[in-house]
Amino acid sequence: TIDTMEIHIDHYKVASPKGRVILFHGVGGNGRMLSALALPLMRNGFEVICPDLPLYGYTRCSKNVTWQTWVSVGTEIVNHYQSTKQLPTFLFGLSAGGMLAYQTATECPQLNGLMASCILDQRNKEVTKHSAKNPYVGMAAKPALALLQRVAGRVRIPMKWIGNMKAIVNNEELAAVLMKDKKSSGARVSLAFIHTMLNPVIKTEPEDFKSCPFLLVHPAEDHWTDLKFSLLFYQRLACEKHTVILEGAGHFPIEEPGLMQQACAAFLESHL
């Protein structure tokens, strides 16, 4: 329980873990959807933590959730598990979880490494324009939400009305199934959450981030968030950084034959 929220966590345990990996989903997922990465990492000897972030999965919350709530929850989770047992700890973020992992890392300087499938700085208008459902929604979203959230911040709408959710996977049938799932891509989120996600308060700019190495594992066929938009932020990072391109993979990389898992495992082993 964090600040009255009952956070559901899928916990992959091993007898003598060599390290700990905390996986963050994005605005179209939940903890279970990260099992394709969690299970191989567990088999490689890592303890893996997959939370359902507020508004998604089985997590229960009655409070008004903002993007900062996610950052606070991520930080609390890192601190909680570090307080129970000190282990080399890494964060991984899928989709919007990439920026969440980065912002959490700025609050938790003791981390060994940071991994993300993309890292989008929504303060950049071009990023918002091209990650929205369509460019027109992207251009209108920020000014409209700035007004609406003041009077109707708690009102919830389907995230798929704003985000280009149909591009979460490069498989139309699977995308349709996911968008019907109220615990993942079909979730309803508050206007306040969307507004704060598009206007994040980033504590440490990338030029000043030096606390741990960063691995960008970006799908080559991502039809939602093109690599060039992640590079706008990634190339500014002052820390040690590495890039792996997942050939043939979509935004949620269901196609690639273990390339993400292999890249992450190699990164983890080299930074224990």
Please name every model-derived segment.
Residues 223-229:
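Conserved alpha/beta-hydrolase "acid-adjacent" motif
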Residues 210, 216-218, 222:
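Short beta-strand/loop motif that positions the catalytic acidic residue
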Residues 38-60:
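Conserved alpha/beta-hydrolase
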Residues 27-39:
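The serine-hydrolase catalytic nucleophile loop
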Residues 1-14:
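N-terminal cap/lid segment of alpha/beta-hydrolase-fold proteins
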Residues 249-261:
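Catalytic histidine-centered segment of alpha/beta-hydrolase-like enzymes
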Residues 56-85:
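Catalytic nucleophile-loop/oxyanion-hole region of alpha/beta-hydrolase
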